[in-house]
Amino acid sequence: MFGTATRPGATRALLLGSGELGKEVAIELQRFGIEVIAADRYADAPAMQVAHKAHVLDMLDGAALRALVNEVKPDLIIPELEAIATDTLAALEQEGVKVVPNARATQLTMNREGIRRLAAETLGLPTSPYHFAQSKEEFVAAVDTIGLPCVVKPVMSSSGKGQSVLRDLAKLDESWTHAQEGGRAGRGKVIVEGFVPFEYEITLLTVRAVDGIHFCQPIGHRQEDGDYRESWQPQAMSEQALARSKEVAAKVVEALGGYGLFGVELFIKGDEVWFSEVSPRPHDTGMVTLISQDLSEFALHVRAILGLPVGTITQYGPSASAVVLREGHSQDIRYQGIGEALALVPGAQLRLFGKPEIAGRRRLGVALARAEDCPTAVEQAKAVAARVDVLF
């Protein structure tokens, strides 16, 4: 049973994280009459602009997070990013507050060490070789063990922050410092990963719901500086690789438990599959589903966390997304050329996130297109994204 938003019997959802992904989740929650309270570390975040109420706080501050939960009394808490006081979430869950998919999943996936040890050591899934390092001395030893080239990441970061590819020992200090500065919780442990000989990587959106586990068609994507630039669906791959990918994804989401959509990242070479990472929430590369499917990843996540059946997922054919990425400094971002951008590609769509400010490089929107094949859809989406003029 759901109540009506703003009424005494309202069903309330607290979004912890109010970026562009949270904004789409908020919209989908409101389709079921759910009252949405959006929280983030800064004011006027995208999801706050469509929520019933908004709160600004440091979500790594456990006392502040608990005070907010006590104030709004949510029926469910929906983590939408990694920088959260997960120990407090776990305690709240023990006290009867519903966290989706669950507090353990949020804890494990916030920290690369937790999810990597679960996948490789508990579930026995194939991954890249890895070592963790807490100190500079341990880092040097880990690089020596893994060998060059290797990938260095903070155990707590996202969107490529603090990540680097180390190819030369002369860059050892630089790589360590970059990882320390890029972690979400400040200085801390890093993971040193060996290269795997993959041909491409995919995101397999996997939904765990009351009516079982469901898979979206695989999503391919291109990354630059650790963050995605374009994504497309479906990614072409062998039947064996797809079947193996589903096996790996199902094992991971079953181990994490709870209901929701999980973005499972995998490396692929031929029929071989390696597990990379997982997020227990919608994935940025999955924004392509806003145009590629009848139920977007956000709609699927909301159905699952509300305990509703997913049913059948219909994919419309080759589709792509391309980000509107700009660099500058402003607290009054304006856009022009939107009509011209949409006119470039009949049927194309554009989402501007409404981010209140920019300081450096930031993702401000996404262009979406469908075509006869994925490469064409990618080029069309890129053309639409490039035509948008951003004024600072």
From Swiss-Prot:
Give the record's pathway. Purine metabolism; IMP biosynthesis via de novo pathway; N(2)-formyl-N(1)-(5-phospho-D-ribosyl)glycinamide from N(1)-(5-phospho-D-ribosyl)glycinamide (formate route): step 1/1
Which superkingdom heads the taxonomic lineage of this protein's source?
Answer: Bacteria
- What keyword terms does UniProt attach to this protein? ATP-binding, Ligase, Magnesium, Metal-binding, Nucleotide-binding, Purine biosynthesis
One Gene Ontology cellular component: cytosol
Could you tell me which InterPro entries the record lists for this protein?
A: ATP-grasp, ATP-grasp_carboxylate-amine, ATP_grasp_subdomain_1, PreATP-grasp_dom_sf, PurT, PurT/PurK_preATP-grasp, PurT_C, Rudment_hybrid_motif
Q: Name one GO biological process term.
A: 'de novo' IMP biosynthetic process
Catalytic activity, per the record?
A: N(1)-(5-phospho-beta-D-ribosyl)glycinamide + formate + ATP = N(2)-formyl-N(1)-(5-phospho-beta-D-ribosyl)glycinamide + ADP + phosphate + H(+)
Positions of ATP binding: R112, K153, S158, S159, G160, K161, G162, Q163, E193, G194, F195, V196, E201
Which residues participate in N(1)-(5-phospho-beta-D-ribosyl)glycinamide binding? Answer: E20, L21, E80, D284, K355, R362, R363
EC no. given is 6.3.1.21
Example GO molecular function: ATP binding
**What is the recorded function of this protein according to its Swiss-Prot or TrEMBL entry?**
Involved in the de novo purine biosynthesis. Catalyzes the transfer of formate to 5-phospho-ribosyl-glycinamide (GAR), producing 5-phospho-ribosyl-N-formylglycinamide (FGAR). Formate is provided by PurU via hydrolysis of 10-formyl-tetrahydrofolate.
Family the entry assigns:
Belongs to the PurK/PurT family.
Per its UniProt record, what NCBIfam families does this chain match? Answer: PRK09288.1, purT
The name under which this protein is listed is Formate-dependent phosphoribosylglycinamide formyltransferase
